[in-house]
């Protein structure tokens, strides 16, 4: 047989992993489900313990399950989330020595596109504006609470990606947003113990810019909304980077953020 025509046969462990993966992505296994013991799973699939162990390792490497140790441990299902993408992205960026401003530039290119799509949604007044307005109202109420107002502001930006209506862009932009969120959250936590936090006037100015974005989305002004987002990012990132410096993208920060969702 021509070697070029030979197709590698999947290992048995890969076939078992594929069946379990299908159960997860189809929703038959949901986030937080505890899989049966490996011995019981092996009997279900008719495979040996080493084969079952390897199948579990495959799924663990994909982030679909987490093996927890201890008396009440086991393999716990984790449905893929945008936070998983952010962790993988952070790993690649950190390995290549990429600094946080690089992520900022990417956000300046991609977030306005999300905002434009939000403004173009026919159901924006029902599906988009109320969510953004609710986050904005809570941020206004918490404007004197250093860490809380930063967290709500980051939720606002993440919502712009989440609500854009395009699944692929939502994942790409959402991962970038969470890369930035992890670093900005860390900076905010440290700054809350010193003089590094922006004064009240600057916080109100940032929230006024959020309000303008909401207003233009509600009006269906796609280009105006995108421009407002672009201008706001330029201002807010300049301030954040001035305070945070020029750090390399940090994987542990991403893992901490991911764990907060589990």
Residue ranges and their predicted role:
Residues 4-5, 95-102, 118-123, 140-144, ...:
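A ubiquitous short alpha-helical element
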Residues 45, 215-216:
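Short alpha-helical segment immediately N-terminal to, or the first helix within
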Residues 1-109, 113-116, 120, 247-250, ...:
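Short linear motifs at protein or domain termini
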Residues 195, 245-258:
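Short, highly charged C-terminal tails/helix-capping segments
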Residues 103, 107-190, 209-215, 224-238, ...:
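Conserved amphipathic alpha-helical segments that form helical-bundle/coiled-coil interaction surfaces
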């Amino acid at each position: 047989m021509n070697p070029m025509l030979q197709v590698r046969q999947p290992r048995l462990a890969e076939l078992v992993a594929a069946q379990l993966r299908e159960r997860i992505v189809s929703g038959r296994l949901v986030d937080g489900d505890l899989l049966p013991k490996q011995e019981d799973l092996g009997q279900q699939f008719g495979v040996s313990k080493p084969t079952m162990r390897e199948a579990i390792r495959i799924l663990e490497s994909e982030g679909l399950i987490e093996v927890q140790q201890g008396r009440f441990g086991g393999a716990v299902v984790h449905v893929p989330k945008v936070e998983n993408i952010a962790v993988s992205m952070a790993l690649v960026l950190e390995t290549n020595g990429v600094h946080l401003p690089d992520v900022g530039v990417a956000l300046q290119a991609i977030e306005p596109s999300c905002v434009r799509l939000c403004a173009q949604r026919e159901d924006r007044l029902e599906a988009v504006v109320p969510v953004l307005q609710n986050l904005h109202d809570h941020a206004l109420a918490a404007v004197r609470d250093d860490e809380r107002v930063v967290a709500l502001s980051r939720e606002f930006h993440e919502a712009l990606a989440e609500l854009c209506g395009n699944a692929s862009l939502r994942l790409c932009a959402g991962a970038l947003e969470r890369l930035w969120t992890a670093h900005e959250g860390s900076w905010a936590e440290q700054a809350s113990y010193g003089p590094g936090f922006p004064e009240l006037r600057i916080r109100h100015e940032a929230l006024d810019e959020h309000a303008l974005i909401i207003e233009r989305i509600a009006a269906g002004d796609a280009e105006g909304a995108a421009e407002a987002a672009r201008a706001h990012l330029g201002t807010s990132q300049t301030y954040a980077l001035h305070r945070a410096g020029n750090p390399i993208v940090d994987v542990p920060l991403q893992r901490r953020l991911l764990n907060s969702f589990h």
